[in-house]
C-alpha cells in the first residue's frame, strides 16, 4: 500500500493525494494550484496519473484549492464516484461552475490577444459543461457514517469546522487481510466559530496526513466573543462617521459569518442605530452560497445556530438587500448616507468590490473593514499596509477612509489548535505527513510535534511512500530542487508582471489626458521590474 503526494506538498494549494492498493487507486481531493504555483506541474492540465484508472475521489471540502481540478479530472477520463458531505456537494454545485466560467473568460481573453498576434487559439482548462459533468458524479454522505468506497476501501467523514460541510476523512484500506486506517485532516477550523460545529478529531489513525497552513502562527484574537465585540465596535464607529461601511469578503463562508453577526447584533440591540442602516450583499456567488447555508439542516449547524434558525431564515432581516444583477450593483454606488456593503472578492483582486472601493476609499466618512487574509501583492494587502493612494480600474484613488482589520475571522486552526487536534487522537499515529503549508509553517509545526514524540515526514511533490516497507520513491517526476523552485517562482512573477503591464497599457490607450502621465509612470515601473526578472 502506497500514498503519493500529488499536490500541496511544501505549498498551500492544489491538495491531491493518491492511495494505491492491491485493488487500484483512489484520490483524496483534486485541487487547483494557485498563486506562484498556478503554472507549475499539473497546474496547466497534466496529471501525474491516468484519471481513468482512479476508482473513486473523496473531497474534504469545497474550496477550489481542494476541488478546482475535478472538472478537468472528469474531462480527462475519470468516471468514478465522488464522495463528499452533502453540504460540500451543494457548495461544489455553485463553485465549480463559477470556476469554469473564470477558465472560459481567461481563455477568451487570451484568444483575443493570440488572434491579433497570429498565434494559435487556446482552449479553457475546462468548461461549464465539464463542471456539470463532474457534478453528476457527486454522492453526498452524512457525517460519521462508515461507507463503502470500493472493494477493500471504507471511509468516514468527520466534521472539522473549517467550512460548511468540511471534513477530515478516515480511510480504511484492507490489503492482505490487514486493515490500515489513513486519516486526511483536510483544512482544520477553529473552536467557537459561528454557524458550524467545532472541529472533531478522528477516533484513531495509523497514518495521518495533516495540514499545516498556520503551523508557525498563533491567532491574536482567541475567542469568538472577542471577534464579535471587535466587529460590533467597528460598526458603531462606522455608523457614527456617517459614511458607507465597505467589507471585502470571500463569497463562501466569510459572507455568511458577517450576516450571522449582523443579525445577532440586530436581535440583541448590540449596535445602536444598526436597524436603520441598509445592508447590501453584492456578490452573485455569495448570494447563492448564503441560500445553501440557510438551507442546511442540523447536521452542519452548532447548537446556537440551531436555536437562531428556528426563528426563521438564518440570515434574513428587514434591512438586508441583495444585488444579483449588474444594474442592482451599480445602484448601490448612487446611495447616500451610511450603508453596509459586503462584496467579493475578499482580497479585492477582482469582482464588484473594486467598484465599491473606488467609490468610497476617498471619502473621509467611509470605513473599509478587512475580515480575511490579504496575500502579498493584492490590492487588499496594499491598502492595509498603509498606502496613501491606490489605482483601481485605471483611476488613482486617494485613501481618506478609515481602514480596519479583524484577524479573528480566520478559518484555519493555528499552531496550538493543530497540536490540540492531533493530541486528541486516542492512539499515536505511526507517521504524520505534513502538507498544505509553506516551509516555515511546516518546519515550525514539525518541531513542535517531534517534541511530543511524533514521527514526522515532510513529503516533496510526487513523492510516494510505501506504508508497508517505509521506502520512499520519487515517482512521476524528479524531485524539485531549490534552484528549480526559484526559476518557477521567477517565471510566475514574470507572468504576473506581464499581465499587469498589458492591462495597464490597454487602459492607457483609453485614458483621459490627466491620468495618462500617471499610467505611463506605472507602465515604466512594470517594464523595469520585468527587465530585472529576466536578467
Describe the predicted segments one by one.
Residues 234-378, 390-391, 426, 443, ...:
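Hard-cation-handling environments
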Residues 103-108, 297-311, 391, 473-496:
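A polyampholytic, Gly/Pro-enriched intrinsically disordered region
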Residues 224-228, 318-328, 347-349, 384-389, ...:
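A general structural motif
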Residues 168, 189-282, 367-372, 390-459:
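Cap/insert and terminal regions of metallo-dependent hydrolase folds
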Residues 8-9, 30-33, 87, 163, ...:
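Active-site metal-binding loops of divalent metal-dependent hydrolases
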Residues 9-14, 21-80, 84-138, 188-198, ...:
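Pre-active-site segment of Zn-dependent metallo-hydrolases
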Residues 99-163, 298-335:
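Metallo-beta-lactamase
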Residues 1-52, 133-197, 331-334, 340, ...:
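Core dinuclear metal-dependent hydrolase active-site scaffold
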Amino acid at each position: 500500500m502506497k500514498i503519493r503526494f500529488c499536490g500541496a506538498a511544501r505549498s498551500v494549494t492544489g491538495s491531491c493525494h493518491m492511495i494505491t492498493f492491491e485493488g487500484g487507486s483512489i484520490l483524496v481531493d483534486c485541487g487547483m494550484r494557485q498563486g506562484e504555483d498556478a503554472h507549475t506541474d499539473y497546474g496547466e492540465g497534466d496529471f501525474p496519473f491516468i484519471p481513468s484508472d482512479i476508482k473513486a475521489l473523496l473531497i474534504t471540502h469545497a474550496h477550489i484549492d481542494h476541488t478546482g481540478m475535478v472538472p478537468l479530472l472528469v474531462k480527462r477520463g475519470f468516471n468514478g464516484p465522488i464522495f463528499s458531505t452533502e453540504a460540500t456537494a451543494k457548495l461544489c454545485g455553485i463553485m465549480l461552475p463559477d470556476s469554469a466560467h473564470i477558465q472560459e473568460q481567461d481563455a477568451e481573453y487570451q484568444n483575443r490577444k493570440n488572434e491579433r498576434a497570429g498565434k494559435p487559439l487556446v482552449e479553457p482548462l475546462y468548461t461549464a459543461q465539464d463542471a456539470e459533468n463532474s457534478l453528476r458524479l457527486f454522492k453526498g454522505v452524512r457525517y460519521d457514517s462508515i461507507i463503502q468506497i470500493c472493494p477493500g476501501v471504507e471511509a468516514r467523514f468527520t466534521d472539522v469546522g473549517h467550512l460548511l460541510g468540511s471534513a477530515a476523512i478516515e480511510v480504511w484500506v484492507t490489503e492482505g487481510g490487514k486493515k490500515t486506517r489513513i486519516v486526511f485532516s483536510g483544512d482544520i477550523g477553529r473552536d467557537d466559530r459561528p454557524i458550524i460545529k467545532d472541529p472533531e478529531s478522528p477516533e484513531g489513525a495509523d497514518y495521518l496526513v495533516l495540514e499545516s497552513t498556520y503551523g508557525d502562527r498563533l491567532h491574536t484574537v482567541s475567542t469568538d466573543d472577542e471577534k464579535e465585540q471587535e466587529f460590533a465596535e467597528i460598526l458603531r464607529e462606522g455608523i457614527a462617521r456617517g459614511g458607507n461601511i465597505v467589507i471585502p469578503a470571500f463569497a463562501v463562508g466569510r459572507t455568511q459569518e458577517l450576516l450571522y453577526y449582523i443579525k445577532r447584533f440586530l436581535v440583541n440591540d448590540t449596535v445602536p442605530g444598526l436597524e436603520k442602516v441598509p445592508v447590501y450583499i453584492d456578490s452573485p456567488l455569495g448570494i447563492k452560497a448564503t441560500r445553501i447555508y440557510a438551507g442546511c439542516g442540523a447536521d452542519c449547524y452548532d447548537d446556537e445556530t440551531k436555536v437562531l434558525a428556528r426563528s426563521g431564515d438564518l440570515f434574513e432581516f428587514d434591512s438586508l438587500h441583495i444585488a444579483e444583477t449588474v444594474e442592482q450593483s451599480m445602484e448601490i454606488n448612487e446611495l447616500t448616507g451610511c450603508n453596509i456593503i459586503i462584496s467579493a472578492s475578499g482580497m479585492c483582486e477582482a469582482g464588484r468590490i473594486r467598484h465599491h472601493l473606488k467609490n468610497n476609499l476617498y471619502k473621509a466618512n467611509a470605513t473599509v473593514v478587512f475580515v480575511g487574509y490579504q496575500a502579498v501583492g493584492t490590492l487588499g494587502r496594499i491598502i492595509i499596509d498603509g498606502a496613501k493612494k491606490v489605482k483601481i480600474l485605471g483611476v488613482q484613488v486617494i485613501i481618506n477612509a478609515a481602514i480596519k482589520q479583524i484577524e479573528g475571522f480566520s478559518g484555519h486552526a493555528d499552531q496550538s489548535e493543530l497540536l490540540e487536534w492531533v493530541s486528541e487522537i486516542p492512539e499515536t499515529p505511526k507517521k504524520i505527513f505534513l502538507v498544505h503549508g509553506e516551509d516555515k509553517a511546516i518546519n515550525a509545526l514539525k518541531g513542535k510535534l517531534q517534541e511530543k514524540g511524533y514521527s514526522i515526514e515532510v513529503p516533496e511533490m510526487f513523492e510516494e511512500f510505501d506504508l508497508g516497507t517505509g521506502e520512499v520513491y520519487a515517482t512521476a517526476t524528479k524531485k524539485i530542487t531549490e534552484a528549480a523552485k526559484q526559476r518557477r517562482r521567477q517565471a510566475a512573477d514574470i507572468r504576473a508582471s506581464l499581465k499587469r503591464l498589458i492591462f495597464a497599457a490597454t487602459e492607457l490607450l483609453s485614458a483621459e489626458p490627466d491620468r495618462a502621465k500617471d499610467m505611463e509612470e506605472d507602465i515604466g515601473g512594470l517594464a523595469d521590474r520585468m527587465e530585472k526578472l529576466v536578467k
